From Swiss-Prot:
GO terms for molecular function: hormone activity. This is Protein RALF-like 26. Belongs to the plant rapid alkalinization factor (RALF) family. Glycans are attached at N61. It comes from Arabidopsis thaliana (Mouse-ear cress).
Length: 76
């Protein structure tokens, strides 16, 4: 029983060491990890990715004049 436990422990240690060796090349954090705007719930004030390259589009076209619905006098 003790021999099996020792073998299992050696296998587990070998797996952990191999995984840490595989990650040895990365010694820095990805900048996206620290950027709160790229997370799942960005705080207010964050803009969607690549939105600074797109032109702004108005929400609705505002016209300050008479329309058929208001029945005001037309200029014609």
């Amino acid at each position: 029983m003790k021999a099996w436990m020792i073998i299992l422990l050696v296998i587990c240690v070998a797996v952990v060491v191999e995984q840490s060796e595989a990650r040895k090349g990365r010694k820095y954090l990805n900048p996206g990890v620290l950027d709160r705007c790229r997370g799942p719930n960005p705080p207010a004030g964050c803009h969607p990715h690549n939105s600074h390259h797109k032109p702004r589009v108005p929400v609705h076209n505002y016209s300050r004049g008479c329309s058929r619905i208001t029945r005001c006098r037309r200029d014609a």
